[in-house]
């Protein structure tokens, strides 16, 4: 009896600890059949940069999910028909406050999540019954870049063993896992752009507590880790959720180059529409958005930055705008402006037009997500600190090599969609880059203006697989990055 319950606990324990791991990234290699027709239906006129969202207390995301354990169970040698646990996950913003993160004053979100997973009518080493897992999580998220500062999870595991006509409830154990990251783990690098990649070295400190009659609680650990990320494509995530037809696939590998998952960021829901975590031990966790409930914004805060892409150590302007939910400007609103990377915190008040002007120095500080393309991308925040706090956010990217107009095509950022009989699919290496006659192939080609000024109309020359040259006129101005 004891050994069988121990097996049950170990399977679920290893699975849920994997939720704290990273996400994976595939490489792209475009190969179209020479015999198939190809046509370009649309070309993006500028790169679709996605800036950081601002959250509010009571924003809520609900997910349906499953935990696939097939490969892990096969490798473990356990005699069981358990393959997946299915369940739900609900995440809610419950607080917004200022705290100290790595010796820096930082505005953070507190996000509380409740997860429930079950597998009914399973057999574990001859024991029939139902497996249930409840998990409560508290995550601290830095508001300026949505980096994860820490996570606290409490996991309750129960196995209801069938006995004649009854079910004997066995409490396998309760596990408490606290994990902190230094520097905070940047799973996003705003503004998001297809083809952009970044890496981060960080220290993960994990402490364990809890109780179990069957398994020893693990020892605390401190480990040095590396995560590598890339925005590999934009398009349909596979989840049919309103307003999320265009989402952004952020994938990553660990220090050994192993795939560890992906997530699809959807700007319309201010978060992820789909998440997958691949654990090297042999199981996968997948969650798909079922509903997003945004709490009412009585006040809307936006930040307009003079030069979103800026030279280092330069005085620039920003305009913080406050309006009601009907778009009418609000005067005499007191806010706190925060450029936390340089410790620049100012109190500002909106004028009669609902706007407050502020100047700040971009500084010379690098961020902790090394992209190789710039020195750093840093969040700019404005918030109303009240019983009902409101936040606004934007990003400034600093680069020592900035010019007035600097256009280039990011070939690694090209996304490909294929439409076949009214079915549109984003192509990648898993699906395969192929087409048949009458398929419509749409290429989204990012043209980025990394300069400070709006560019004049220009022409993009494209050479097809057969050597045919196409000239695409970009008549609309390409705005700075």
Regions found by a protein language model. Give the residues of each.
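Secretory targeting signatures
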Residues: 1-62, 244-250, 295-300, 318-322, ...
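Acidic, serine/threonine-rich low-complexity disordered tracts
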Residues: 30-137, 153-306, 397-401
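Surface-exposed loop/turn positions
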Residues: 59, 196, 314-316, 333, ...
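Beta-strand-rich interaction surfaces with strong enrichment in secreted/lumenal proteins
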Residues: 189, 345-349, 433, 471
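The feature marks long extracellular or luminal low-complexity segments
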Residues: 271, 292-409, 413, 449, ...
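Short, solvent-exposed loop/linker segments at the N-terminal edge
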Residues: 307-314, 417-418, 425, 432-439
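Single conserved hydrophobic/aromatic residue that forms the stacking wall/gate
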Residues: 472-481
């Amino acid at each position: 009896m004891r050994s069988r319950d121990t097996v049950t606990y170990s399977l679920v324990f290893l699975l849920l600890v994997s939720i704290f791991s990273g996400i994976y990234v595939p490489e792209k290699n475009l190969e179209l059949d020479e015999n198939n027709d190809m046509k370009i239906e649309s070309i993006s006129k500028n790169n679709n940069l996605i800036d950081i969202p601002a959250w509010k207390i009571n924003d809520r995301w609900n997910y349906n999910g499953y935990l696939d354990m097939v490969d892990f169970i096969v490798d473990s040698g356990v005699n069981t028909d358990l393959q997946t646990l299915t369940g739900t996950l609900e995440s809610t913003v419950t607080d917004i406050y200022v705290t100290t993160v790595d010796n820096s004053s930082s505005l953070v979100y507190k996000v509380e999540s409740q997860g429930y997973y079950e597998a009914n009518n399973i057999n574990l080493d001859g024991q029939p019954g139902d497996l249930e897992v409840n998990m409560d999580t508290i995550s601290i998220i830095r508001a300026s870049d949505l980096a994860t500062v820490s996570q606290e999870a409490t996991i309750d595991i129960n196995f209801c063993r069938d006995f004649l006509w009854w079910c004997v409830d066995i409490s396998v154990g309760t596990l408490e896992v606290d994990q902190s990251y230094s520097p905070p783990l940047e799973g996003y690098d705003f503004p998001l752009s297809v083809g952009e990649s970044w890496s981060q070295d960080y220290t993960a400190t994990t402490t364990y507590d809890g109780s179990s009659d069957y398994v020893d609680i693990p020892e605390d650990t401190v480990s040095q880790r590396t995560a590598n990320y890339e925005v590999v494509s934009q398009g349909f995530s596979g989840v049919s959720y309103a307003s999320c037809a265009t989402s952004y696939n952020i994938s990553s590998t660990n220090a050994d180059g192993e795939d560890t998952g992906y997530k699809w960021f959807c700007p319309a829901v201010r978060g992820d529409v789909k998440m997958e975590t691949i654990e090297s031990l042999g199981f996968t966790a997948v969650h798909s958005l079922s509903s997003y409930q945004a709490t009412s914004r009585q006040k809307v805060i936006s930040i307009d930055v003079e030069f979103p892409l800026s030279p280092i150590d330069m005085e620039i302007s920003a305009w913080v705008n406050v309006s009601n939910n009907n778009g009418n400007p609000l005067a005499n609103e007191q806010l706190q402006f925060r450029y936390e990377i340089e410790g620049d915190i100012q109190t500002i008040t909106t004028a009669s037009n609902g706007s407050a002007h502020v100047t700040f120095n971009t500084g010379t500080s690098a961020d902790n997500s090394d992209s190789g393309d710039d020195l750093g991308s840093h969040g700019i925040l404005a918030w109303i600190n009240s019983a009902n706090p409101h936040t606004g956010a934007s990003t400034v990217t600093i680069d020592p090599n900035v010019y007035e107009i600097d256009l280039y095509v990011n070939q690694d950022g090209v996304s490909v969609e294929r439409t076949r009989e009214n079915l549109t699919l984003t192509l990648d290496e898993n699906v395969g880059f192929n087409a048949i006659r009458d398929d419509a192939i749409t290429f989204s080609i990012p043209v980025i203006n990394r300069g400070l000024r709006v560019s004049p109309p220009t022409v993009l020359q494209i050479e097809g697989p057969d050597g045919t040259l196409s000239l695409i006129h970009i008549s609309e101005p390409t705005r700075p990055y």
